[in-house]
């Protein structure tokens, strides 16, 4: 019996994730909740977000490990806080099971040596509890095996995957900003995301081009100190259906990455593929596990303004190539990164001896 604790919606029992689990016939239960962690600054995540996660984790552990029957063999959680809470309950109940699995682990370095050391110490403690951690690149698996070599945790790689709804309406903020900044709004390209982004390079690349760029990013840090060109529209509160609308109507997607040693950009990349949108993305070892240059995407050198600008110009001028990339991207999504593929890969990793 596997217990899952999705935090994206209280109605997760009827989600595509739940339906694919049911289709596989794997004994499982879902204990859903809605824990929204959308904050412009990291301090609010620490002060407001993590207490929400802690409350959800305690409630989930009680429902899963005490109130439910039969008890689970495995629990799959989405945060380090949940690992600790479930580990405490497992110890207090004098049980060897369930196995505790951390899904979607990413370990980012901090520029301050002390902060880096403290985070390393903290996660060594987390991995003295967790039995398994799922990562979304093989590079990270090898890296974490080395960093946390004395831990009890088994690190596994599975590709990221998702389902995205095609039903979407623009937000009021989106309508107002577009009307104010682009009264004759027409074609635009889209960039989105906050983690590991290199918007400085992207802004320099698009500044002289005759095309609008919409950037969906709610992080103050990711955009701090940047000069925003006149043809760039920032959407800081664009989520859910409004974000999908932005994606659906874009000519194509550009994902500039600053990091090359962790998973970054895959979510937006796969969302673009689901809508048959070609993507220009920074070439990194993790990205190259998901797409192929010239087949379903264009890969560019990190920090190279000229190469990025030329890639954008190519997709703007070559309609046939753009359509071919989009079609191949959608085929790749359906075969490798849709919800069915993701759930199949996840269950396969959980069931490994």
Which residue stretches match the model-derived regions?
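Conserved donor-binding/catalytic core segment of Leloir-type glycosyltransferases
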Residues: 181-197, 203-214
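Short acidic/histidine- and often glycine-rich active-site loop of Leloir-type glycosyltransferases
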Residues: 224-225, 284-294, 298-299
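Acidic donor-binding loop of glycosyltransferase active sites
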Residues: 247-264, 277-278
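Membrane-proximal helix-turn-helix segments that form the acceptor-binding/catalytic region
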Residues: 62-70, 95, 114-133
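Donor nucleotide-sugar binding/catalytic pocket of nucleotide-sugar-dependent glycosyltransferases
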Residues: 131-145, 150-172, 185
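Nucleotide-activated donor-binding/catalytic signature segment of Leloir-type glycosyltransferases, i.e.
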Residues: 217, 223-247
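Conserved acidic donor-binding segment of nucleotide-sugar-dependent glycosyltransferases
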Residues: 293-294, 298-305, 314-320
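A short, well-ordered alpha-helix in the C-terminal region of glycosyltransferases
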Residues: 307, 314, 321-336, 342-348
